[in-house]
Amino acid sequence: MTRIILILTATFFACALGASTGGSHPLRPWWNALRSSGRIVGGFEVPVEEVPFQVSLSGVGSSHFCGGSLLSERWVMTAGHCAASGQTNLQVRIGSSQHASGGQLIKVKKVNRHPKYDEVTTDYDFALLELEETVTFSDSCAPVKLPQKDAPVNEGTCLQVSGWGNTQNPSESSEVLRAAYVPAVSQKECHKAYLSFGGVTDRMVCAGFKEGGKDSCQGDSGGPLVHDNTLVGVVSWGYGCAQAGYPGVYARVASVRDWVKEVSGL
């Protein structure tokens, strides 16, 4: 119980202290300024045992390019822009703090991208990956909880994002799993911030500090945004990485619970 209290206290202060502590797109002319494939900026190294649902997605015989979240023994959720329906030769690594070694390496049997995924607006940025083999659960490999349908994310809620992406700091390796705490931003505030880019939809949730400094970045896309071991969002897009005035934008998992159940039974 003491450890739980200490972790919760540390989490609160991580969000309260804020930033002081610490690919091209053919249909969007401004896509290079935005990052559609998430990395943790301003975060800290984290053992996979603290985020045992974290998944690394790669092509068979190639390197990590997106993150994901383990939902069950056979299902992983990632971003729609990370994997297209019908795509083959994908694999996931689960249960390792390194994206290139350790843990369980399992091939993807089938990619189910959300049928309403929009490449222009990045709306419905979800994909469910069915695995060829059953995952063996352990301290370093366990599923994340799914939220209730349309569950709200209250402004200021302290959320954790994790992945192996670009840290924007040459002294910090992105080979090792990293995480950062970021507060949820109101839908109204986020929509206003991104109005010149078309705004955000009800399938999106935003998180980050007004002053910037902590965020996901290139390479983290598809990875988890969690609160209380529940998958709140999927790393999706944003303007730059950890830019002041531009919170990270995540695909809101609670908005597609019916689809998740229809496809995976979860």
Curated annotation (Swiss-Prot):
It holds the Pfam family Trypsin. Residues 40-265 form the Peptidase S1 domain. Midgut. The record marks 215 as: Required for specificity. The keyword Protease applies. Residues 1-18 form the signal peptide. It is found in: Secreted, Extracellular space. One of its GO terms (biological process) is digestion. It comes from the Eukaryota. PROSITE patterns: TRYPSIN_DOM (PS50240), TRYPSIN_HIS (PS00134), TRYPSIN_SER (PS00135). Its EC number is 3.4.21.4. The active site is at residues 81, 125, 221. Disulfide bonds join 66-82, 190-206, 217-241. Residues 19-39 form a propeptide. One of its GO terms (molecular function) is serine-type endopeptidase activity. It catalyses: Preferential cleavage: Arg-|-Xaa, Lys-|-Xaa. Major function may be to aid in digestion of the blood meal. Belongs to the peptidase S1 family. This is Trypsin 5G1. It comes from Aedes aegypti (Yellowfever mosquito).
